[in-house]
UniProtKB/Swiss-Prot annotation:
This is GTP cyclohydrolase 1 type 2 homolog. Homohexamer. A divalent metal cation 1 binds at residues 76, 113, 235. Belongs to the GTP cyclohydrolase I type 2/NIF3 family. It comes from Deinococcus radiodurans (strain ATCC 13939 / DSM 20539 / JCM 16871 / CCUG 27074 / LMG 4051 / NBRC 15346 / NCIMB 9279 / VKM B-1422 / R1). InterPro entries: DUF34/NIF3 (IPR002678), DUF34/NIF3_sf (IPR036069).
Length: 263
């Protein structure tokens, strides 16, 4: 694990319920048919003075958040995914750790992929300086990704190298399309299912996270390059940007807890 240095500018405080309301409105939590229980998943202290942010909710992450003195852990992947789950075994240990630390757990899954300002896909598009942005990446009738144009055309390997510099991880490249990259679609995490949509929009390349075997041939048959930059590594952007936005709004310091999975 690596822990980013705590931000030092914020010295604020906000009530838990006020922050939860603000997050719900800012992220449009109720706008998506997402079964993953977006919002406050575990209730803790009623005053928020420090935030930790992380991609996943593992026991290690919860322990690190508690040790950091955080009052709220902000995550992309929470503890609940649309089905009843007994509080036993590892799940019990996670819940117990949060409750014993009086730690709030707030999860934002699809709303944080899709958000136009601090979302994973919006932040990646900004980091790549994409222009002429368009909604992209259909998910149950909602566009949660983004498509855009590079400032200048790049070779496929040059573009993959640029992604590697951005994420710090070696990319897997399926070169099924043009060797020259100009129009790019971005869908973080498990977004390989957008290959056909990318082809229909005239995109030459899809940037996503996690490789899936069933989509290997689609890259070549639809004529679209696919760059897999890692599920984890493509989803660090949103929680960091959201935590920074909270600091800007309320003066609450934060730090990022980095537990990369290599996937």
């Amino acid at each position: 694990m690596t822990v980013s240095p705590s931000s030092q500018t914020g010295r604020g405080e906000i009530g838990r319920d006020e922050l939860v309301r603000w997050l719900g409105e800012y992220l449009r939590i109720g706008a998506y048919p997402d079964p993953s229980l977006n919002g406050l998943q575990i209730q803790g202290t009623d005053k928020i003075r420090r935030i930790a942010a992380s991609v996943d909710t593992s026991l290690q992450t919860l322990q690190a958040a508690a040790e950091s003195g955080a009052d709220l852990l902000l995550v992309h992947h929470g503890l609940f995914w649309g089905r009843p789950l007994a509080i036993t075994g590892p799940h019990y240990e996670r819940v117990r750790t949060a409750i014993q630390a009086d730690l709030n757990l707030y999860a934002a899954h699809i709303p944080l992929d899709a958000h136009p300002e601090v979302g994973n896909n919006a932040m990646i598009a900004r980091a790549l300086s994409l222009t002429d942005l368009q909604p992209f990446g259909d998910w149950q009738g909602h566009k949660i990704g983004v498509a855009g144009t590079l400032p200048r055309e790049l070779g496929l390997q040059d573009f993959a190298d640029r992604i590697q510099k951005l994420t710090g991880e070696i990319c897997l490249v399926h070169g099924g399309g043009s060797p020259n990259i100009h129009r790019v679609g971005v869908t973080s995490g498990s977004g390989a299912g957008a290959i056909a949509e990318a082809a229909a929009m005239g995109l030459d390349t899809l940037l996503t996270g996690e490789p899936e075997h069933k989509y290997f041939h689609d890259s070549f048959e639809y004529g679209v390059n696919v760059i897999f930059a890692g599920h984890y590594e493509t989803e660090v952007f949103g929680v960091r940007a959201l935590a920074a936005r909270i600091e800007d709004e309320f003066g609450i310091p934060w730090q990022f807890l980095n537990f990369p999975t290599g996937l």
